[in-house]
Design a protein with these regions (language model features):
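Flexible, low-complexity charged segments
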Residues: 1-133
């Protein structure tokens, strides 16, 4: 019993020490860096016509402050990459009459955007709509 208590106390002291070291770092090192993209709207193609529109709003989480600054300067290129991935997704998987597979879209966008810029930690979907025509 005493050994279990000592193990628990040791584990708690390690956790407390790691929290104290995290608190001693500057707030800018702890805060994630976010860069917002304007809304992207792509057509949803049916068999012979446009069935609706897919509308998505994205926020990029950068690895660091420097990466966030670089993302802001490369915004046209990143927006073009996101638009291409959204078009491909809407062509293959979207419908104006069914729910959007946000998990698949997130995976596709993350893969495409991370290839375009390695400073992107992840792509967050903050708004997603599929609107029938």
């Amino acid at each position: 019993m005493r050994k279990a208590v000592n193990t628990a106390i040791t584990a708690l002291s390690v956790l407390a020490a790691s929290d104290a070291s995290a608190a001693s770092r500057p707030a800018t090192a702890l805060a994630p860096q976010f860069v917002a993209l304007s809304e992207i709207t792509t057509p949803i193609f049916g068999e012979s016509r446009i069935e609706g529109a897919l509308s998505v709003t994205l926020v990029l989480e950068a690895d660091s402050v420097g990466a966030a600054d670089t993302l802001r300067t490369r915004m046209p290129e990143l927006r073009a990459t996101a638009l291409t991935a959204a078009l491909e997704f809407s062509r293959l998987y979207a419908s104006g009459y069914t729910p959007v597979d946000a998990g698949r879209l997130s995976a596709d966008l993350n893969a495409a955007m991370k290839r375009a810029h390695p400073g992107i930690a992840r792509v967050l979907i903050v708004r997603l709509d599929a609107i029938p025509a």
